[in-house]
Amino acid sequence: MLISLSQWLQLLYPEQLGFLRVFQYLTFRAVMAAMTALLIGLALGPIVIRRLTELKIGQPIREYGVAEHMVKQGTPTMGGALILLAIAISTLLWFDWSNRFVWIVMIVTFGFGAIGWVDDWRKVVDKNPEGMRSREKYFWQSLIGLVAALYLAFSVSETSNLRVLELFIRWVQSGFSNDLPPKADLIVPFFKSISYPLGVFGFIFLTYVVIVGSSNAVNLTDGLDGLAIMPVVMVGSALGIFAYATGSSVYANYLLLPHIPGAGELMIFCAAMAGAGLAFLWFNAYPAQVFMGDVGALALGGALGTIAVIVRQEVVLAIMGGIFVLEALSVMAQVTWFKYTKRRYGAGRRILLMAPLHHHFEKSGWKETQVVVRFWIITMLLCLVGLSSLKLR
């Protein structure tokens, strides 16, 4: 919004307001987006926490979980709404409203946030321990993921919504041909000439898995004070760098990345997400004053997945978000093995002391803060590995 306002003012007063040209610089707007989201989060945080406390929107704690967590019973939850509010205000202020990629990321983010809101509301306010039924939650996640995947399948190779529509019509008229331009290939990091053609349906399937999988993986990771939000900030910031490089024809050609016009504007969203995340961490650090809840975790995970798909870095996302991947795999392995052994031996057996993975380490004797900080360190290292793929090819 501010970029359009600055352009209008420059047309009216070109000599007096020439300094407003700074709004054209993507890096300047990204820094300002991060600062804006950070300040909004810090300013509104105490108000949101106080309001959640007054409404008695407190986090229920499982009795069969980690015993030390019982002291967290009643800590305000649904604080993810604060993150989303800060992201929304900051992004709307600083990004170019004509950019379709930012809009699709925001739609996915707030769509998943709405699912998380309903789930949290049923758990905390309606006192329904199940929240949304798994099938109901998965249906809505799948609907949003598939719609986004279908749009992005024709969007990454085109420069406008009109051309996206034209490409989609040609695809339908061709009898749903599986051909797709090279920009929709699966890119293998660290290799400059290796990529795998996905085709329309392959791209849609991969995009669906990445978006929905990322959303649920971040949600599973959000189990300790500050555990999920800092990796989200790190991975989101790294993806912002990929977005900047991918959106620039100069950097994309130099780094052998697919050039996707308009993708650079996603750096604004990534910066806002980082700023909002740091503001939330101020209140979510041990001992947490507020939890983000599903409204925050599902939304942020969906955002990371969508951005990674747009900048064609799905594999790099899996590397940088390795903690999220391990947390999700730990739950899948635990549940699968338990069901298998129960069916075969009559009694279920466990691979881990408790899933997700962070609870296993707690049960093993690690302090909560040790688990959190060590997972942060691992994520930092993985992000550096992911960023190194920009040049190491």
Swiss-Prot record:
InterPro entries: Glycosyl_transferase_4, PNAcMuramoyl-5peptid_Trfase, PNAcMuramoyl-5peptid_Trfase_CS
Source superkingdom: Bacteria
Pathway recorded for this protein: Cell wall biogenesis; peptidoglycan biosynthesis
Transmembrane segments: 29-49, 75-95, 101-121, 138-158, 193-213, 226-246, 263-283, 290-310, 315-335, 370-390
Reactions performed catalytically: UDP-N-acetyl-alpha-D-muramoyl-L-alanyl-gamma-D-glutamyl-meso-2,6-diaminopimeloyl-D-alanyl-D-alanine + di-trans,octa-cis-undecaprenyl phosphate = di-trans,octa-cis-undecaprenyl diphospho-N-acetyl-alpha-D-muramoyl-L-alanyl-D-glutamyl-meso-2,6-diaminopimeloyl-D-alanyl-D-alanine + UMP
GO biological process, one term: cell wall organization
Cofactor: Mg(2+)
Keyword Plastid recorded: no
Keyword list, A-Z: Cell cycle, Cell division, Cell inner membrane, Cell membrane, Cell shape, Cell wall biogenesis/degradation, Magnesium, Membrane, Metal-binding, Peptidoglycan synthesis, Transferase, Transmembrane, Transmembrane helix
Pfam families recorded: Glycos_transf_4
Main location: membrane
Any GO CC annotation of this UniProt entry: plasma membrane
Keyword hit for Cell membrane: yes
EC annotation from Swiss-Prot or TrEMBL: 2.7.8.13
Subcellular location, record wording: Cell inner membrane
Family membership: Belongs to the glycosyltransferase 4 family. MraY subfamily.
HAMAP family the record matches: MraY
Role of this protein: Catalyzes the initial step of the lipid cycle reactions in the biosynthesis of the cell wall peptidoglycan: transfers peptidoglycan precursor phospho-MurNAc-pentapeptide from UDP-MurNAc-pentapeptide onto the lipid carrier undecaprenyl phosphate, yielding undecaprenyl-pyrophosphoryl-MurNAc-pentapeptide, known as lipid I.
Annotated NCBIfam families: mraY
Protein name: Phospho-N-acetylmuramoyl-pentapeptide-transferase
Gene name of the encoded protein: mraY
